[in-house]
Swiss-Prot record:
<comment type="similarity">
    <text>Belongs to the YejK family.</text>
</comment>
<dbReference type="GO" id="GO:0043590">
    <property type="term" value="C:bacterial nucleoid"/>
</dbReference>
<dbReference type="InterPro" id="IPR007358">
    <property type="entry name" value="Nucleoid_associated_NdpA"/>
</dbReference>
<keyword id="KW-0963">Cytoplasm</keyword>
<dbReference type="GO" id="GO:0005737">
    <property type="term" value="C:cytoplasm"/>
</dbReference>
<dbReference type="GO" id="GO:0003690">
    <property type="term" value="F:double-stranded DNA binding"/>
</dbReference>
<dbReference type="Pfam" id="PF04245">
    <property type="entry name" value="NA37"/>
</dbReference>
<dbReference type="GO" id="GO:0003727">
    <property type="term" value="F:single-stranded RNA binding"/>
</dbReference>
<protein>
    <recommendedName>
        <fullName>Nucleoid-associated protein PSPA7_4451</fullName>
    </recommendedName>
</protein>
Length: 340
């Protein structure tokens, strides 16, 4: 993961309305194993977070970041100058947000594979302990990436090469209420373009419809479910979206376009690339059971809605039966009535 440029600035601010103080670095960080380790750990922590996805607002006085980034990429300003202008803008937005707290702000332009990224993160320290060379226990401060709450990553290559894309920016969703992280999103100038949970739910609905339409055996349906969930989870782990054509090929290498064509023909309105939402995925794994001529299999997210479990009576109540099953039951009932 080659790091092209990296720098850290410091903004001191408490969430009490006091002015923010900026301590800006005037030179890039040199190449070192430490900065490589930091960026690797940052990416690992960032990829594990729930994120929103979007694109740049139109450049304006309120959203100047994309213009500064474009100038840097065109060579009209250097990386230090770009980061300095950006962090001064962030300082102003922090002062307008009483709930915000300061920290070290990392800017890193790096390459992963053939793709260029810009990572921006607000880093905080935690107090710990260490054992020194004299074997004494001493206080120790370290960057606490487990407490990463404000960070964004811009896919520079996607932004520059795909003008229609609406998901080349990702940023961590704030847990402490929307207003806590709004200023950071406004700093980037990001407009949400893809609702990751909604897109993931729509994809899973399309998959369930596809499985039903193909009248798949239980084992085959289970295998395809695992393929979908494993692929989506692996993409979420590395911070990359799912692509419908790749997913379709993984699900059936004999008919690699089958699922993709089904989605397109049914017009689910899905984007070609979908950022996976891990919470939605975790609700999708299947419950299965087989005994004495009875076989039951259903997706976990249906429990509590279409399927209700009564532990005391040891029963399942199913509503909105699959069309094929309903038709079979109706035919059987009609046959019984005609012979009675």
């Amino acid at each position: 993961m080659p790091i092209k440029h990296a720098i850290v600035h410091l903004i001191e601010k408490k969430p009490d309305g006091t002015p923010a103080m900026l301590h800006a670095r005037d030179a890039e960080l040199g190449d070192s194993q430490a900065i490589e380790n930091l960026l690797a750990d940052l990416n690992e922590s960032y990829n594990a977070k729930n994120k929103a996805w979007g694109f740049f607002q139109g450049e304006s006085g309120a959203y100047p970041f994309s213009g500064w980034l474009g100038d840097y990429l065109e060579g009209d300003r250097d990386f230090v100058g770009f980061s300095r202008e950006a962090v001064e803008h962030l300082q102003k937005l922090m002062e307008e947000s009483n709930l915000s707290t300061g920290g070290h702000i990392l800017f890193a332009h790096y390459q992963q594979g053939m793709t260029d990224y810009l990572a921006i993160a607000l880093l905080h320290h935690s107090e710990g302990v260490a054992v020194n060379e004299s074997l004494e226990v001493t206080p120790s401060r370290h960057l606490d990436l487990a407490q990463l709450h404000l960070a964004a990553r811009i896919n520079i290559s996607e932004w520059r090469n795909n003008k229609q894309s609406k998901q080349y920016i990702s940023f961590i969703k704030g847990k402490g209420g929307k207003k806590v992280s709004d200023y950071f999103r406004d700093f980037i100038g990001c407009q949400e373009g893809v609702d990751s949970p909604s897109e993931t739910r729509t994809l899973l609905k399309a998959f369930s419809d596809f499985v039903e339409s193909e009248d798949m055996a239980e084992e085959q349906a289970r295998e395809k479910t695992e393929t979908l969930v494993d692929y989506a989870t692996s993409q979420a782990r590395i911070g990359e979206p799912m692509t419908l054509d790749a997913l379709s090929e993984l699900m059936d290498d004999q008919q690699p376009r089958a699922f993709y064509d089904y989605i397109r023909n049914k017009d689910y309105g899905l984007s070609p690339e979908i950022p996976a939402d891990k919470r939605t995925l975790n609700q999708f794994r299947r419950f299965t059971g087989r005994a004495e001529g009875l076989s039951i299999s259903f997706e976990a997210h249906l429990l509590g809605s279409r399927i209700e479990y009564d532990e005391e009576r040891d029963t399942l109540r199913i509503s909105s039966l699959p069309t094929q099953l309903r038709d079979q039951l109706k035919r059987r009932k009609a046959e019984q009535e005609s012979t009675s």
